[in-house]
């Protein structure tokens, strides 16, 4: 790494701590500010449409009302919503049921969502269309029991909660802001995302992963999503979040969307980048109810439940990859390549790294020792760095330098 480059990197790291100019730091945003060092959450993006990859119709009658989706060790897990039994279904990547597990000691009032951390799977029994429920709960299951293929029954623990700011339980049905179908888990807390029928926003409530009695969920922040949120997914490696939802186009016809959230300050997920992806209509997708992410990736699965009205649309499974829409590179220095700024993704990465809007020589340096790890020409096919050790690196593409993290 040349002396000028090292000096530049040192200077910018110092400047980050002293001057920290705030602005939109995402090169993909309409209002990208190349001089900004600190992301202030102001980025906005052009309207983005994406066609999900169709995997299969979920042909089993057991999955017609599936709601919620989680990915554990390459297996998908799903549940059914209100009025159904207390079963969890394991699916393969084609959507076929490979295992049925009975959750003992719990009820299914209105199961709506699944999430997980490293030790437990959580079921959200918090569907509340009428706004009148006073028995909202989270069901907690030990993952080590669930993943024991020799058993078909696991014990569930029911944890009750209420919203700290709800005092009126009269509804009316589908016209209030205290429904919920989405949540995510970290090591020690759960974040619930409301389904606001009344104002089309989402409110985030925080509760711990374990408590006694009835816990009072604390409101922490809100965001205008322009629709109804039906599920959420979280990747603990990259801290990326996806919110699945739909908006009514009138006369009962609706289209689905996914909000991508990343590069936010811990605890305040709506103060970072927020990008909406339009994914299609109910006639193609069905009623989208489940989403999950692959580890360290903005790719994953979406599931839908059956629509039975004037027409019947079966439950379905889809795949997506939104890596091209998310820039996680920490920019050390950058210049435009023609009219477009370049960026690297994914970041953090496990193996292959891609560079958008760039062709030419790239150099990868160890951030600690400054030693050259890789040098070669980039020709749009991605570079495989799976053989290098985990750590922090500097990737130099032309005159642009990015800080990259290898997991």
Write out the residue ranges for each language-model feature.
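Positively charged n-region of N-terminal signal peptides that target proteins for export
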Residues: 1-5, 69, 406-407
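Short, acidic, Ser/Thr-enriched surface-loop or helix-capping motifs
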Residues: 26, 33, 92, 366-367
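Sequence/structural signature of beta-propeller domains
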Residues: 46-329
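C-terminal outer-membrane/trafficking sorting elements
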Residues: 334-407
